[in-house]
Amino acid sequence: MTIALIYGGEGYEHSVSMLGFQHLFPILEKNYRVLPIFIDTHGEFWLKNKRVFPTYGGFADSDGEVYRVDCAFPLLHGDMGEDGVVQSALALGKIPFIGCTPTVGALCRDKFTVKAVAKSLGIPTLPARLISRDDEIALPCFIKPSGLGSSIGAGAARDEAELQFALENAFRYTDRVIIEPLLESKRELECGYFGVKGKELFTNAGEILSQGGFYDYDSKYGGSTKTATVADVSPKINEKIKEYSARLVAALGVRHISRIDFFLVGEDIYFNEINTMPGFTEESLYPRMLAEHGIGIPKMFEMLIGDIL
């Protein structure tokens, strides 16, 4: 069994994928022949020192040699990775892959659109609207790009100086920027989804134990933030989060894996975003939440590969 482990990526979360690759590769190569396909920041595919490109049933180099694979795992996050772009190339090459279809990946990548879907399903969300650089904005607020992950380009604004910085930072990445109320006191909860062969698991809620403030990129991947694999919440809150997650997954057409993020303010739950390719670093919460339900990484891949082949 040969699996292409695709990592890196052209987008802003390149380094996150690299960390996940370092964690996953030694685990996978115990059970599979792993073809490490690296995508550089220019969007070029590499197999070791050879440039390759997706072709029918595998990857080909410029000499015409084809490296066949049985399936692929696109360990890519955010723009140009989790948004259906690479998945489209795999689909065109008839390479079975783990994760969402290109259409679903593109849909789930846009926070504003997914919030509208959640609202239509009766799932509470924070009020959000798209803004331009010249809009009048009431303070305090929270500003973030609509199509990026890992909190890239996102920031709080409590005064005019912070507002100008947040706007400049967000619009550096995209013209599609959203504004939300600023929650000074909140808990950040996550629910993991795992689905194969018509059976679905929604994990108990986990929690990001941020030390106050904003859970930004450096906090997520700098090793300073603590997490709880099982959040200390009431059974009612836990079940409600799983219920909301199930509604979203069904409506959006998510398959295989995802992580659904929520805010908890007092007893009020607010949907935040969905990630169709959760992190797989050593610190990542998603694989640990699955492990709490008896699904470690080797078993996860065995079940996922069995679902697509």
Question: What label would you give each PLM region?
Answer:
Residues V249-E282, L290:
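Conserved metal-phosphate-binding beta-hairpin within the catalytic cores
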Residues M1-T103, R109, T113:
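ATP-binding N-terminal substructure of ATP-dependent carboxylate-amine bond-forming enzymes
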Residues E207-S258, L285-L309:
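Active-site "cap" helix and flanking loop/linker of ATP-utilizing ligase/carboxylase catalytic domains
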Residues E160-E243, L264, D268-Y270:
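Phosphate-binding site of ATP-dependent enzymes
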Residues G78, S151, Q211, N275-M289:
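Glycine-rich phosphate/pyrophosphate-binding beta-alpha loops
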Residues M1-Y7, G11, Q22, G105-S185, ...:
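Active-site nucleotide/adenylate-binding loops and adjacent lid/helix of ATP-dependent enzymes
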